[in-house]
């Protein structure tokens, strides 16, 4: 069994993607009505990437408003766990695995998570946020930095992702990839993942697969 197990946050630990889809859908309708399915277009992108790509030029004046809206949204949103996650992370902990959260979310958002779940930090041995990376996903940098925290090589690590950018990041890092079909359908992410799950509620097949690695 491999030693390092790294997790994205939204769509992997928390089932928040539907909430963000609603938020960005409303932003798109109001500010970018010419772009259909704006929420789908920006899935897996960091806030700076979204702002640079869509809120520059004529819409540059809207940047602060978008950031303010997002901060307020995250301050009041729910953070429901992906079903079965807590049992799965406990299983890994009992195996003595090195676990890390590797998220493009910033410390401001994580402060809301810690406020909601004071023990959240204890679920992982390391937590890496946007402030820790030189480059965002799909660059391999976030996951390679996580491996460095444990002095592990990529071949010793498994990553869990839901977005295309996240899956590409793991692939580029040379790690085994578990894809979660919480954001995109299984057939859409299958080519980028070594193993695909809907959630963690039927862990036995996944656990057996991981133990063979």
PLM regions and their residue ranges:
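Asp-based, Mg2+/Mn2+-dependent phosphohydrolase catalytic module
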Residues: 1-3, 90, 106-108, 112-213
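Active-site neighborhood of HAD-like aspartate-dependent phosphohydrolases
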Residues: 1-40, 57
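Conserved phosphate-coupling serine/threonine residues in phosphotransfer and NTP-handling enzymes
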Residues: 12, 103-105
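Helix-loop "lid/cap" segments that line or gate small-molecule binding pockets
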Residues: 27, 46-58, 113, 147
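Short, surface-exposed acidic
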Residues: 31-41, 57-67, 120-124, 154
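Residue-level signature of the cytosolic catalytic core of signaling kinases
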Residues: 43-45, 81
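Metal-dependent phosphoesterase signature
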Residues: 52-90, 95
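Short phosphate-binding/catalytic loops that engage adenosine nucleotides
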Residues: 95-97, 175
């Amino acid at each position: 069994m491999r030693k390092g197990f790294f997790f994205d946050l939204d769509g992997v630990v928390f089932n928040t993607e539907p909430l963000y889809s609603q938020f960005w859908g409303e932003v798109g309708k109001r500010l970018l009505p010419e772009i259909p399915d704006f929420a789908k277009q920006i899935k897996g992108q960091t806030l700076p990437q979204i702002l640079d790509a869509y809120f520059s030029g004529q819409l540059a004046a809207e940047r602060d408003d978008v950031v303010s809206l997002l901060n307020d949204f995250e301050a009041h949103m729910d953070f429901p766990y992906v079903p079965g996650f807590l049992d799965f992370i406990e299983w890994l902990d009992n195996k003595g695995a090195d676990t890390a959260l590797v998220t493009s979310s910033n410390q401001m958002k994580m402060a809301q998570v810690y406020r909601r779940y004071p023990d959240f930090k204890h679920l992982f041995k390391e937590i890496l946020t946007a402030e820790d990376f030189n480059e965002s996903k799909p660059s391999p940098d976030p996951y390679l930095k996580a491996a460095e925290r444990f002095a592990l090589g990529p071949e010793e690590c498994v990553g869990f992702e839901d977005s295309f950018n996240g899956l590409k990041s793991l692939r580029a890092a040379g790690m085994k990839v578990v894809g979660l079909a919480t954001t995109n359908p299984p057939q859409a992410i299958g080519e980028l993942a070594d193993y695909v799950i809907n959630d963690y509620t039927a862990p036995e097949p996944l656990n057996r697969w991981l133990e063979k690695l």
